[in-house]
Regions:
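A short, active-site helix/loop in glycosyltransferases that binds the activated sugar's phosphate group
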Residues: 124-126, 168-201, 268-273, 390
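Conserved catalytic-core segment of nucleotide-activated headgroup transferases in glycan assembly
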Residues: 208-276, 284-296
């Protein structure tokens, strides 16, 4: 099978300048009979050296495309002008990316068995190649994201206005999505929202593949203190629930006898100081050269995600590397784990201190939960299995 992959971002083993890791891990363990050639606008700015390394890792060729003038102008805008123009456009900026005539002709001349398009906004490119069988990966539904964000009480008036404007753009995009493609998302609610907006399209939810992990790591909580980690950037995806969580930990400083805490990511300085001043042993790491290696130095990951869609890659990272994950519903959605069996889930931050006391009092039981979580994710989110499901969509009836 010969498949042409088209994306705004170049694929990479980690998320670089966007969600570049998902397509990488869907390709890295593909079947030997699936040949892929990549065409990308490289909006995430991978260097020539990095692109060459990815080509070798994925056993394929990457073609970097020039942007059409309109898209280059839109994506090059900065500051107030960028905000103003984006607000006035009927569609999100990446929608205006197009293949030039020579590239369209070249792809058609290759006579591929299918075209795989990555990025919800690239429906215009889908129309350029409408006669070729297509699979279009979201990977999430932006309308669902903005709808969930607007439910949050901490969203201010200006941000709320911007969210409503962007939600209308993405709703228009989804409503006009071409029926020449089959659509692929990594969230069940994302699929349902896409179908609610446009019942005419074929949308499929497939499990998100896990990323790289340390298969040799043994699950045994550290002595004398269990090592907690909160990983990721302190942004609107986590900030509100993270503040509530840190307040609870600061108020239950007796837990510091059993735990030490690490913030792994940017923007956590105020919360790091809050815990330290409360009496916790807290460490702040803003950058790790090898993220998986640093993650493996810990035992339990706290994931207080306030809002989001799809599948959270950092949660999969933690579980496959043998950490016990304690997270909100948004952190755990679309992952094949269940509370009390392969993970721990909470609704309100005030529940977390009791969970941590249970872990400290019964380490072995919770190590077993972490082990069960790793086994479930390695089985249900297996990269070979995910790749087979994705490329198998080209063989489905109607393509």
């Amino acid at each position: 099978m010969k498949v042409i992959y088209i994306s705004n971002m170049a694929p990479a083993s980690d998320n670089i300048g966007g969600t570049s890791a998902l397509p990488y891990h869907l390709m890295v363990h593909r079947s030997d009979d699936v040949e892929v050639e990549v065409f990308t606008f490289n909006t995430n700015g991978l260097s020539a050296e990095k692109i060459a390394a990815v080509e070798k890792e994925l056993r394929l060729k990457i073609n970097v495309l020039p942007m059409n003038r309109l898209a280059a102008w839109l994506l090059g805008l900065k500051g107030v002008m960028s905000l103003l123009v984006r607000m006035l456009l009927p569609y999100p900026p990446h929608y205006y990316l197009r293949l030039d005539r020579a590239t369209v002709a070249h792809i058609k001349a290759m006579r591929p068995d299918g075209v795989w398009i990555y990025g919800e906004e690239l429906t215009g490119i889908s129309r350029q190649l409408s006669e070729i069988p297509q699979v279009h990966t979201g990977p999430d539904c932006e309308v669902l994201y903005y709808e969930r964000l607007l439910l949050q009480p901490w969203v201010g008036r200006i941000k709320r206005l911007r969210c409503r404007v962007m939600m209308r753009k993405f709703r228009r995009l989804a409503a006009n999505a071409p029926t020449c493609a089959r659509y692929h998302v990594v969230g069940a609610a994302d699929r349902d929202m896409q179908l609610k907006i446009n019942p005419e399209i074929d949308v499929n939810f497939l499990r998100h593949p896990h990323y790289n992990y340390n298969a040799e790591r043994k699950i045994k909580f550290a002595e004398p203190r269990i090592r907690l980690v909160l990983a990721g950037r302190n942004d609107h995806y986590m900030h509100a629930d993270a503040v509530a969580l840190i307040d609870e930990l600061a108020a239950n400083v007796d837990l510091a006898e059993h735990y030490e805490f690490t913030f792994l990511g940017k923007g956590w300085e105020p919360m790091h100081e809050r815990l330290r001043c409360a009496g916790w042993q807290s460490c702040l790491i803003t950058f790790a050269e090898d993220y998986a290696e640093e993650l493996c130095r810990h035992d339990v990951q706290l994931t207080p995600i306030s809002v989001g869609t799809g599948t959270k890659g950092k949660v999969l990272d933690a579980i496959t590397n043998g950490l016990l994950v304690i997270g909100t519903a948004y952190a755990m959605e679309n992952i094949a784990v269940h509370h009390g069996e392969e993970c721990l889930q909470y609704e309100r931050a005030c529940e977390v201190p009791a969970l941590l006391r249970d872990i400290a009092n019964d380490r072995r039981r919770h190590e077993a939960i972490a082990e069960a979580g790793r086994a479930a994710v390695l089985r249900e989110h297996n990269r070979t299995r995910a790749s087979q499901a994705l490329f198998g969509m080209f063989a489905a009836k109607g393509l």
